[in-house]
Swiss-Prot record:
Domain of life where this protein originates: Bacteria
Gene it is expressed from: rsgA
Quaternary context: Monomer. Associates with 30S ribosomal subunit, binds 16S rRNA.
Family: Belongs to the TRAFAC class YlqF/YawG GTPase family. RsgA subfamily.
GO CC terms: cytoplasm
UniProtKB keywords: Cytoplasm, GTP-binding, Hydrolase, Metal-binding, Nucleotide-binding, Ribosome biogenesis, RNA-binding, rRNA-binding, Zinc
InterPro entries: G_CP_dom, NA-bd_OB-fold, P-loop_NTPase, Ribosome_biogen_GTPase_RsgA, RsgA_GTPase_dom
Binding residues for GTP: N163, K164, A165, D166, G217, Q218, S219, G220, V221, G222, K223, S224, S225
Protein name per UniProt: Small ribosomal subunit biogenesis GTPase RsgA
The keyword GTP-binding is assigned to this record: yes
Co-factor: note: Binds 1 zinc ion per subunit.
Source species taxonomy: Bacteria, Pseudomonadati, Pseudomonadota, Gammaproteobacteria, Pseudomonadales
Length: 343
């Protein structure tokens, strides 16, 4: 059944209702901020956003006596959207609460489009994106490549992580080895672990120590189990694979930041089945495929689409085996998913 198209008046009414709801929520929050600021607030200091709950955030103090303590803070109305990993300036209250007064500059941000296609940051100040996949649900190179393009576009180092290595068997071993070989040949760091059995977890901890990392990957690949294995006692809820679809159920609803003993931090974000790249251009996608770098600009035609054009450097590299067919298929699939204006 085709999706019903809304007319202009219906769209206007929906936006009006949503705007009124947002205004009421902002007004309530503004009154709470005014009440706090009218009381006995402490001096301004820096803090770290460790979780976001709509109009409020949890922050961890970074200075003085409050360092390491967690506070639920209100947001001033003029602040930009905050995400887990943001560093902020805040003032503490006397009831375990406080007020965020400013956002500090970000060194990086990981973004993706929301349902309306508008760019939305999901984590800040990340310097390592851990792309998690597993034998089950079946890994798809296209989804892995989407994450790699996103990491390259954001300037964040990627780490490929095959979890549930204990589920490798005769039925999936050949396909998995072929998949991993492609990324190893490209020079991407890759680890194989089993959160369930503990295999490879010490090596993973060493990779995470000293970095601000975020785990990404489709539901069911074991991100929550990895957190439980890395940080005993956190008890992130684990969901089983659906017997009907073979896909995972979402178990983490709010992005949270955790600390590792070695000084590194982990942002555990909600699992997603499809990672959109609507905010990137064709040039961004091409730049996200690292094996293309030395070939771009060498085609016969300046506006080459790398499809069927004669003298295409990428097609010649594909024929010569310097570009894997799997990666070229992913590249074309990602381009086809972009808005027409960017294609």
């Amino acid at each position: 059944m085709a999706k019903r198209q809304l007319n202009r008046r219906q769209n206007w009414r929906i936006e009006k209702i949503q705007g009124e709801r947002a205004a009421r929520a902002a007004k309530r929050e503004s009154r709470a901020v005014e009440a706090l600021e009218g009381g006995d607030l402490g001096p301004e200091q820096t803090g770290l956003v460790i979780a976001h709950f709509g109009v409020q955030v949890e922050i961890e103090g970074l200075q003085g006596e409050l360092a390491g303590q967690v506070f639920r803070c209100h947001l001033r109305a003029n602040l930009p959207a905050l995400v887990t990993g943001d560093q902020v300036v805040w003032r503490p209250g006397n009831q375990g609460d406080g007020v965020i007064v400013a956002q500090l500059p970000r060194s990086s941000e990981l973004c993706r489009p929301d349902m309306r296609g508008q760019l939305k940051p999901v984590a800040a100040n990340v310097d390592q994106i851990v792309i998690v996949f597993a034998p089950l649900p079946e890994p798809h190179a296209n989804l892995i490549d989407r994450y790699l393009v996103a990491a390259e576009h954001a300037g964040i180092r990627p780490l490929l992580l095959l979890n549930k290595a204990d589920l490798i068997d005769e039925q999936n071993q050949v396909a998995l080895e072929a998949l991993l070989k492609v990324y190893r040949q490209l020079g991407y760091p890759l680890l194989e672990v089993s959160a369930h059995q503990g295999d490879g977890m010490e090596q993973l901890k060493k990779r995470l120590d000293g970095h601000v990392s975020v785990f990404v990957g489709q539901s069911g690949v074991g991100k929550s189990s990895l957190v439980n294995g890395l940080l005993p006692g956190v008890d992130t809820r684990v969901g089983a694979l659906s017997e009907l679809t073979g896909k995972g159920t979402h178990t983490t609803t709010t992005a949270r930041l955790f600390h590792f003993p070695g000084g590194g931090q982990l942002i555990d974000s909600p699992g997603i089945r499809e990672f959109g790249l609507g905010h990137v251009s064709r040039d961004d996608v091409e730049a996200g495929f690292i094996e293309f770098h030395d070939l771009l600009g060498r085609c016969r035609f300046r506006d080459c689409k790398h499809d069927r054009e004669p003298g295409c450097a990428l097609l010649q590299a594909l024929e010569d085996g310097r570009i894997q067919a799997q990666r070229m298929a992913s590249y074309r699939h990602i381009l086809a998913s972009l808005p027409e204006d960017d294609y």
